[in-house]
Amino acid sequence: GLTEHQEGKVSRYLLKTRTDNPTWSDERVLAKVTRYRNAEIRVRSKVIARTEIAYAAGNGKTAMWNQLAKDGLIDPNVMDKEWLGIADNRQCGVCDELNGSVVPFDKSFTASGATFMQEPAHPNCRCVTTVITRKKKT
């Protein structure tokens, strides 16, 4: 279904369509608003699909890292995870806060009071996490 915000957009579109077209029949108004609502549903569907793909990729990557550690192919005692955002004008505050964060291999990232083992931090998140070798303290 649609988010509360999207339902509000559809309601406002209905009111505007009725106001702007007082001579239209109810059927014509309904047809126009239905097309608009269906377009919003397509947008919502794409957001859900992108986010679920990001969750699946993040979970798969984490499972792979854990298996590599279990098999002794990487040493989690010298590995960290790094959160990598897309530092542009579309990056949200949470992702901006997480960008460049480094945590121990088996720990969570924290931003704005929430914790994340890996991406995504929210719907449509474009961030990724990667495993890095822990930097030696000098």
Say what each PLM segment does:
Residues 1-124, 130-138:
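Domain-core detector
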